[in-house]
Swiss-Prot record:
Entry protein name: Probable succinyl-CoA:3-ketoacid coenzyme A transferase subunit A
Assigned protein family: Belongs to the 3-oxoacid CoA-transferase subunit A family.
PANTHER family assigned to the protein according to its UniProt record, in alphabetical order: ACETATE COA-TRANSFERASE SUBUNIT ALPHA, KETOACID-COENZYME A TRANSFERASE
Gene it is expressed from: scoA
Binding site for CoA: 24-30
Keyword Transferase: yes
Organism: Mycobacterium bovis (strain ATCC BAA-935 / AF2122/97)
Length: 248
């Protein structure tokens, strides 16, 4: 089945207000910028995003934040986005902070049909005990806090129960993809993309290099086409650098 659509706008056209999105990438590496830009242009709002971080100001998911399109986010590292911090502290954005490895496993588990799993990460902290601020009110008071989670002991070690994540849509960026949706990621751009691709009920992939079925060595496929519903060819995407260090 040919899953290629002509434009990013066409690919995201049915993402409605209030949808949940799993978005791949780490920092500015491997993020689906064309799909995010198309979402901004579509006017969709009240979104819930699941992503390692929310980009930086005006880039990646930071673009959706800039236009105030995100209602809630499940994230791990968010310290590089000033607008994110402003919206969170002003009570405009709900934030569920999750340990990075736990977030990756929650996405992977959701995609594999695993409803929940136990992990030692977060035991003895507000991650497990509850009380972590999720939303502030306009005056700076805490309006919503995280609930306490179930804990259980195995072989003398305490673990906390974490739930798998499934989202309405997933947006991912791949280096190479074929018309059947088989994807290959390149180097660090693989971060969170495979997990997000499996977690979405409808997964949309933007690919730098579009090839015909059979051209990708099956042994190098990172996300099989069974997980992917739409493919958009986005050649020569901008390669933004989050932090540049040069020798004096």
């Amino acid at each position: 089945m040919d899953k290629v659509v002509a434009t990013a706008a066409e690919a995201v056209a049915d993402i409605a207000n209030g949808s949940s999105l799993a978005v791949g990438g780490f920092g500015l590496c491997g993020i689906p910028e064309a799909l995010i830009a198309a979402l901004v242009d579509s006017g969709v709002t009240d979104l819930e995003t699941v992503s390692n971080n929310c980009g930086i100001d005006g880039v990646g998911l930071g673009l959706l934040l800039q236009h105030k399109r995100i209602r809630r986010t499940v994230s791990s590292y968010v310290g590089e986005n000033k607008e994110f911090a402003r919206q969170f502290l002003a009570g405009e954005l709900e934030v569920e902070l999750t340990p990075q490895g736990t977030l990756a496993e929650r996405l992977r588990a959701g995609g594999m049909g695993i409803p929940a799993f136990y992990t030692p990460a977060g035991v003895g902290t507000q991650v497990a005990d509850g009380g972590l601020p999720w939303r502030y009110d306009a005056s700076g008071g805490v309006a919503v806090v995280s609930p306490a989670k179930e804990t259980r002991e195995f072989d003398g070690v305490t673990y906390v129960l974490e739930r798998g994540i499934r989202t309405d849509f997933a947006l991912v960026h791949a280096w190479q993809g074929d018309r059947h949706g088989n994807l290959m990621y390149r180097h660090a751009a693989a971060n969170f993309n495979p997990e997000c691709a499996s977690a979405g009920r409808i997964t949309i992939a933007e690919v730098e290099h579009l090839v015909e079925p059979g051209e990708i060595d099956p042994a190098t496929v990172h996300t099989p086409g069974v997980f992917v519903h739409r493919v958009v060819h986005v050649p020569n995407p901008a390669k933004k650098i989050e932090r540049e260090t040069v020798r004096q």
